[in-house]
């Protein structure tokens, strides 16, 4: 499983740590990728030119895991990491994955017809407005992708603060149901 963090942070920050560590303890091999970052206070739009670099990092991560014999590769991404993963999935080349968990994705899925794997769109009831306002469009975009779904977690904010165990439980349920052991 590849983990992609959000903007302005590192591969073990915030909710990434419990995802990476708890899912590893529960049998998932995890690879947390350092995504391209700008200063923490930089808003999302200046990140757009970095998306090709992010896609290359994800491509290399997929190739690394496949090269080491892993099957059933998923990407679990948060926030800006989800936007970068969406870009990657629009330009997959030979780096096919088997499932994608997009946590706190703002805006819409771009070109979901290019997605070849089930998508789990997971967000909090108290998430950012950009995430909440586009939830219906995201649900409609993945409706035709077999095995995909969307879930709003009651009480959760964008970072699942204080609800990390619930986040891990939901992600694990999806991965367990979509990836072959």
Give each language-model segment a name.
Residues 98-160:
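The feature captures the conserved acid-bearing segment of alpha/beta-hydrolase catalytic domains
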Residues 63-117:
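Primarily recognizes the serine-hydrolase "nucleophile elbow" in alpha/beta-hydrolase
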Residues 148-181:
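C-terminal catalytic histidine-bearing segment of alpha/beta-hydrolase fold enzymes
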């Amino acid at each position: 499983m590849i983990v992609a963090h959000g903007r302005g942070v590192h591969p073990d920050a915030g909710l990434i740590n419990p995802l990476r560590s708890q899912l590893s303890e529960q049998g998932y091999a995890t690879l947390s990728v350092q995504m391209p970052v700008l200063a923490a206070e930089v808003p999302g739009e200046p990140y757009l030119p970095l998306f090709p670099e992010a896609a290359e990092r994800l491509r290399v991560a997929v190739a690394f895991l496949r090269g080491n014999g892993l099957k059933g590769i998923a990407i679990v991404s948060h926030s800006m990491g989800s936007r970068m993963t969406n870009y990657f999935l629009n330009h997959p080349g030979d780096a096919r994955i088997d499932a994608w968990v997009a946590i706190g994705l703002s805006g819409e899925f771009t070109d979901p017809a290019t997605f070849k794997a089930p998508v789990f769109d997971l967000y909090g009831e108290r998430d950012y407005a950009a995430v909440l306002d586009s939830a219906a469009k995201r649900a409609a975009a993945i409706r035709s992708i077999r095995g995909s779904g969307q879930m709003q977690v009651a009480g959760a904010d964008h970072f699942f603060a204080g609800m990390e165990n619930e986040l891990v439980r939901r992600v694990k349920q999806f991965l367990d149901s979509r990836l072959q052991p």
